[in-house]
From Swiss-Prot:
The N-terminus is involved in homooligomerization. RNA binds at residues 30, 33, 67, 105-106, 185, 195. Homodimer. Homohexamer; ring-shaped, necessary to form the nucleocapsid. Homopentamers; opened pentamers in solution. Binds to viral genomic RNA. Interacts with glycoprotein Gn; this interaction allows packaging of nucleocapsids into virions. GO terms for cellular component: helical viral capsid; host cell endoplasmic reticulum-Golgi intermediate compartment; host cell Golgi apparatus; host cell nucleus; ribonucleoprotein complex; viral nucleocapsid. It is found in: Virion; Host cytoplasm; Host nucleus; Host endoplasmic reticulum-Golgi intermediate compartment. Belongs to the phlebovirus nucleocapsid protein family. This is Nucleoprotein. It comes from the Viruses. Keywords: Capsid protein, Helical capsid protein, Host cytoplasm, Host Golgi apparatus, Host nucleus, Ribonucleoprotein, RNA-binding, Viral nucleoprotein, Virion.
Amino acid sequence: MDNYQELRVQFAAQAVDRNEIEQWVREFAYQGFDARRVIELLKQYGGADWEKDAKKMIVLALTRGNKPRRMMMKMSKEGKATVEALINKYKLKEGNPSRDELTLSRVAAALAGWTCQALVVLSEWLPVTGTTMDGLSPAYPRHMMHPSFAGMVDPSLPGDYLRAILDAHSLYLLQFSRVINPNLRGRTKEEVAATFTQPMNAAVNSNFISHEKRREFLKAFGLVDSNGKPSAAVMAAAQAYKTAA
């Protein structure tokens, strides 16, 4: 008969392999959508025009939200026609779509590299503006001002650097969550953070974009230097998050 107590002791004595565990975390991470499938569907529905259409959908997602039918109620005639065409062409959905359906937010997340660059231009049209974020942390990094930014974070950065970037990004997510969800406005920072931490970590640990490419994006955005060290603005935002209420 097995000695279960002894087996328990023997198991506890086994080494903890950091690389192996981190690989499992990436494999088992929660994934709300498949970025590869999103791009596949965009190309399938859009043909030669998919890239230009995707940019339109990203701008809509950033400035108007994820419900195309509702946003059309307050929009110019030309805008309504454009959105209607996108809905029909790409079969855009709202709510909780299946793996094989597109939403505006999925397009923005799947193409996060362009999304984050567009934020620099669109920062004053967002639910939480760049000016508002500057009031919380001077020169707040515009590239961080959308949940899709998490997909650009390199999880292989040194621990302190990675934590600073995620804290800096969380400063925006904290404000964003309270603006778009009135039920969270009276909640503590910890309670609000609990609503965005899982999807943020899922995006960070996804394997759609390599660590090397993510590091290149972060450097191009001016968020880290060649050694992966966060910029002064990122560090300031990280500190602001730690002291935020």
